[in-house]
């Protein structure tokens, strides 16, 4: 039991202290659909970005915030499945870790977007975050298309 708690402590320490946002520019749609690790990374980042946008705009633009929230929640279970596969752990275990990772990344995105907003009067202008959002939009569109095709078979 002590060993298990120690491993969890080490994992959370790495997650909370060592994480910085890197642009998603090195990822491709092909990688997303063919590489489980890339898929997990992209899902985690896109869900976090959508969640950060939801938090930042929910007062001024509640309908738009609701749309971003729905997109994040649609992708969320697939992120957990992907995390479970890449870490070879149960869905329940993956869900706990994934939630923590997404929460931490969401906070990093919020901080970055606020800094950029103060500097450029825009959350996205002159920042990699706008490029990440465009990439996440393409991923989400493609992902939804694949899911709807699988459901129609």
Language-model-derived ranges and their functions:
Residues 4-14:
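Sec-dependent N-terminal signal peptides
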Residues 11, 53-54, 143:
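Generic hydrophobic alpha-helical segments
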Residues 18-26:
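Cleaved targeting-peptide boundary
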Residues 25-31, 116:
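Domain-scale activation on soluble regions of proteins
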Residues 76-153:
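Compact alpha-helical subdomains of small soluble proteins
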């Amino acid at each position: 039991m002590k060993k298990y708690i120690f491993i969890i402590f080490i994992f959370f320490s790495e997650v909370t202290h060592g994480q910085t946002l890197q642009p998603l520019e090195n990822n491709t749609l092909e990688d997303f659909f063919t590489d489980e690790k890339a898929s997990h990374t992209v899902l985690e980042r896109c869900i976090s970005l959508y969640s950060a946008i939801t938090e930042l705009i929910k007062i001024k633009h509640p309908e738009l915030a609701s749309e971003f929230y729905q997109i994040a929640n649609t992708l969320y279970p697939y992120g957990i499945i992907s995390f479970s596969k890449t870490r070879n752990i149960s869905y329940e275990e993956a869900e706990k870790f994934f939630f923590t990772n997404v929460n931490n990344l969401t906070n990093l995105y919020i901080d970055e977007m606020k800094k950029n907003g103060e500097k450029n009067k825009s959350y996205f202008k002159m920042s990699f975050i706008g490029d990440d959002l465009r990439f996440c939009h393409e991923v989400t569109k493609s992902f939804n298309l694949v899911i709807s095709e699988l459901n129609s078979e």
